């Protein structure tokens, strides 16, 4: 078509006619505007197919189109209901019929239950404790880091601690200077209640987090505690206030108190054997005790929550049942193995005689 139009222009030079070309798309497509019936969908590109939008060369793209779908075997609703009511034995048999290992590919149904409370937090908000002795000026970097941490700690004590507690109803006159006497009383009452196995008094003096740690000591044993005296006046080293869950307004306050006391402590097992400490020996103990209060409510009470163990605190005394041998005790120990009278040969001979007697009879 295009060639014929160009030839005509060259063959008639006397008549000045402008060259005009018309582009006709020879593509076989159902949306070609030149064919209104196909464009509107009246006729089909492939008359053998009911769908008007199928490709002209259907065989070429049939495999590709078949890969677009994925067949998934889904169990019926009745089968699901039946499986949910099956006991473990029948469920195991059903899985074995399908060729599945119930102990490898199917986890057993386990029921886990845990107590949740929003009046306490299961942990300590800020376990940082400022060091007892300041660092020397020989190492300037360490001294600078220590001073920086001390200033940050004091700022957080006011900003995220005392200032936030005083905004709560019933705590407008809160003062950390008068709190130490109350903390010492709570500390002694909590240990006396643990010694007497008084759960009601323990829940008044300690939180759920502390109860889970202290109760096993008296559940299968006994504790003897006596607070002899207070060596140094107790002082508050950290005050923190936070809300649980976050941004909920359910504020909980924690105060860390340094307590230097002289006390007697003895821990016995269920048979009456001494495990730790002594009822007669007095010891000086330095502890960093954490007290907690649910200040979101007006009638919140301060309770013992836990303890912080800094790096410079001396390790606890070992138990009396297991201890490390001294060099003298290790030298006395005999490393030679002794033969045990198992009487294996005698038992074999007796069994042989019984068998012969049974055969003869």
Swiss-Prot record:
Keyword check for Mitochondrion: yes
Domain of life: Eukaryota
Bilayer-spanning residue ranges: none
Subcellular location: Mitochondrion
GO cellular component: mitochondrion; ribonucleoprotein complex; ribosome
Alphabetical keyword list: Mitochondrion, Ribonucleoprotein, Ribosomal protein, Transit peptide
Family: Belongs to the mitochondrion-specific ribosomal protein mL45 family.
Protein name, as recorded: Large ribosomal subunit protein mL45
Species per Swiss-Prot/TrEMBL record: Caenorhabditis briggsae
């Amino acid at each position: 078509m295009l060639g014929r139009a160009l030839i005509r222009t060259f063959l008639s030079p006397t008549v000045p006619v402008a060259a005009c070309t018309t582009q006709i798309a020879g593509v076989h497509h159902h949306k070609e505007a030149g064919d209104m019936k196909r464009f509107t969908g009246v006729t089909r590109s492939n008359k053998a197919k009911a769908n008007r939008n199928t490709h002209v060369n259907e065989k070429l793209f049939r495999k590709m189109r078949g890969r677009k779908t994925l067949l998934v075997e889904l169990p019926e609703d009745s089968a699901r209901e039946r499986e949910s009511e099956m006991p473990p034995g029948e469920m195991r048999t059903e899985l074995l019929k399908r060729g599945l290992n119930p102990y490898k590919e199917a986890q057993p149904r386990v029921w886990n239950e845990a107590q949740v409370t929003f009046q306490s937090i299961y942990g300590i908000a800020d376990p940082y404790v400022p060091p007892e002795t300041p660092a020397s000026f020989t190492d300037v970097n360490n001294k600078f880091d220590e001073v920086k941490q001390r200033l940050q700690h004091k700022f957080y004590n006011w900003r995220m601690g005392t200032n936030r507690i005083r905004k709560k109803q019933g705590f407008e006159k809160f003062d950390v200077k008068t709190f130490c006497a109350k903390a010492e009383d709570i500390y002694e009452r909590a240990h006396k209640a643990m010694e007497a196995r008084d759960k009601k008094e323990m829940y008044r003096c300690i939180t759920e987090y502390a109860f889970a740690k202290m109760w096993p000591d008296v559940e299968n044993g006994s504790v003897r505690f006596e607070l002899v005296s207070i060596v140094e006046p107790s002082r508050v080293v950290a005050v923190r206030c936070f809300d649980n869950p976050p941004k909920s307004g359910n504020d909980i306050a924690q105060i860390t108190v340094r307590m230097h006391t002289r006390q007697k402590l003895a821990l016995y097992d269920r048979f009456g054997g001494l495990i730790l400490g002594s009822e007669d020996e007095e010891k000086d103990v330095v502890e960093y005790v954490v007290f907690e209060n649910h200040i979101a409510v007006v009638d919140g009470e301060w309770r013992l929550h836990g303890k912080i163990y800094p790096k410079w605190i001396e390790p606890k005394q070992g138990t009396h049942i297991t201890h490390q041998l001294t060099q003298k005790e290790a030298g006395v120990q005999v490393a030679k193995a002794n033969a045990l009278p198992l009487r294996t040969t005698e038992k074999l001979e007796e069994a042989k005689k019984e068998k012969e007697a049974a055969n003869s009879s």
